[in-house]
Amino acid sequence: EIERPLIEVLAAMELWGVKLDLDLLKSLSVELDRRLKKLEKQIYEMAGQEFNINSPTQLSQILFYKLNLPASKKTRINKGLSTATDILEELAPLNPLAGAVLEYRQLAKLKSTYTDSLIKLVNPETGRVHTSYNQTITATGRLSSSDPNLQNIPIRGEMGKKVRQAFIPEKGHELLSADYSQIELRLLAHLSGDPLLRQIFLEDRDIHMETARRVFGEAVELFPEEMRRRAKIINFS
């Protein structure tokens, strides 16, 4: 009664596909390439030498041995010193190189995973990208998407939002975005009767930011979007 009627709907959605503004994606790819080259030059200047920015080993040599940035217990891993995102976020207030590498990684992922890949995935006959909607994969009953994953298009940051603008409607039509506001946690507040949760929602405060402030403290002010994203994962876990 629930899943079977949806099969035809999803099949039609997959067949119809999603229209893309290829000119916009191509211009974004060029812009990202320009910004990456500029960032690369700045990173080399900060480091005082050229190195492979994509190599964790070479980056750790620069950060922890050449620049003598502090390495915490969390930083130490079996094969050396970690340069994972959370480590670079901790180092960013101490040296601009760490922040520049974070930005470089974000832009490089946008270019390789989205602008360049989506262009290649457009069907030449339909001019659209055709994803697969997985109806019975997730434990929660939500849909997932693959080949490509159109449910994971970036929304954070200036360039991420520009990638989303490449998804366009047919002429004379509009794309509609509708979403419940933190519906799962509102239900949790109602069913549990938790006074703090209820108060946060009654005062129309952002539950994810409230969690971020309690968990991450001052780091929230430095990386509000990233800290909110992590707090959201914590809340739903």
Question: Where are these predicted regions, by residue range?
Answer:
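Structured ligand/cofactor/substrate-binding pocket environments in proteins
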Residues: 173-205
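Conserved "right-hand" nucleotidyltransferase catalytic core of DNA-directed polymerases
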Residues: 1-158, 168, 172-174, 181-184, ...
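A generic local secondary-structure boundary/capping motif
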Residues: 164-166
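Feature representing long, continuous alpha-helical segments
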Residues: 161, 185-186, 190, 206-210, ...
